[in-house]
């Protein structure tokens, strides 16, 4: 693999295409506008669909339709746009639909600023819409991780049948760094339709697939929610990705995620050079989990 110097937003979009994403629906907003711009050029070259929606509300429901039909699909936005998508994200979570959503976070609340920020953490990791759901969430700290975890997000969204978020920020989106891309996986690109998808093949199956988040039977809704809760617990056990540095001999643990962790690492090195025993816990997968190192220091979980 050859290294290529790319801006984070464009590298993310290229990674999605190589992961088998063939449909993108979104709306431009700083600091992620290069993502839809890149898709608008590249998706037609691979037979994909790019559509700039009239709003973020429209784009998330276009995503819902593509995911329900079994396609690998993606959208991206920033704080105010992600807020507009919350009803649709809740519907996708309630329908067990895999999709990838990128939040290039900017300052808030409200329209805020276009500067990098991490203020959407709780909105993402605790489910921002109604109904007490969870999503997969990954927080890269450099452009290479932006590539790697975008690809992983598509795989895990399909595996667990749920939305997956990339939690980045304007610094990562606008930063240029050398990255390596894996070769496109032909198995992914030529994947057979998912057996639950509304793909118009009911005659071949002998039954019709219906995708909906509506369940009017209270007992059945309870069953569905319990299944999701059990799934979340399994993910918290099996899908933990965390970087721990210097935690075995430390007196103090600093916690940071995403681009800010780069700065914290430098601060820790300075402190260690001065004789302070300081360690780092960096959550990468940000669905609720506990860290053994944090538990040992009675710090609790994240």
Where do the language-model regions lie?
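Thiamine diphosphate
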Residues: 1-127, 134
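Glycine-/acidic-rich phosphate or pyrophosphate-binding loops and their flanking alpha/beta elements
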Residues: 7-11, 229-253, 265-269
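Short, solvent-exposed amphipathic alpha-helical segments in soluble enzyme
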Residues: 40-42, 90-93, 118, 151-156, ...
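A general structural motif
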Residues: 113-117, 224-240, 255-264, 283-288
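Conserved thiamine diphosphate
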Residues: 116-169
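Conformationally flexible catalytic loops at phosphate/diphosphate-handling active centers
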Residues: 161-244
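Generic long, charged, amphipathic alpha-helical segments
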Residues: 268-288
């Amino acid at each position: 693999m050859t290294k290529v110097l790319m801006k984070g937003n464009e590298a993310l979009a290229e990674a999605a295409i190589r992961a088998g994403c063939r449909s993108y629906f979104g709306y431009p907003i700083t600091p992620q506008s290069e993502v839809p711009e890149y898709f608008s050029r590249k998706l037609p070259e691979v037979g994909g669909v790019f559509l700039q929606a009239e709003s973020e509300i429209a784009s998330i429901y276009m995503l819902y339709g593509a995911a329900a039909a079994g396609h690998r699909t993606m959208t991206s936005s920033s704080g105010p746009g992600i807020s507009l998508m919350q009803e649709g994200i809740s519907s996708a979570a309630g329908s067990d639909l895999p999709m990838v959503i990128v939040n290039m976070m900017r300052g808030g609340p409200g329209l805020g600023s276009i500067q990098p920020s991490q203020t959407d953490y709780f909105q993402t990791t605790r489910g921002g819409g109604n109904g007490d759901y969870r999503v997969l969430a990954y927080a890269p700290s450099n452009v290479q991780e932006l590539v790697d975890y975008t690809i992983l997000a598509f795989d895990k969204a399909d595996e667990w049948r749920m939305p997956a978020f990339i939690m980045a920020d304007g610094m990562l989106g606008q930063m240029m760094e050398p990255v390596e891309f894996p070769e496109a996986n032909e198995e992914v690109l030529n994947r057979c339709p998912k057996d639950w998808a509304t793909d118009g093949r009911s005659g071949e199956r002998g039954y019709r697939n219906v995708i909906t988040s509506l369940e009017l039977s209270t007992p059945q809704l309870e069953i569905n929610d319990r299944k999701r809760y059990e799934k979340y617990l399994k993910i918290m056990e099996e899908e933990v990705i965390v970087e721990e540095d210097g935690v075995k001999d430390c007196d103090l643990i600093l916690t940071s995620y995403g681009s800010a962790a780069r700065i914290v690492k430098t601060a820790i090195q300075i402190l260690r050079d001065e004789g302070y025993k300081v360690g780092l816990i960096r959550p990468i997968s940000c669905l609720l989990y506990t860290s053994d190192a944090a538990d040992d220091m009675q710090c609790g979980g994240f």
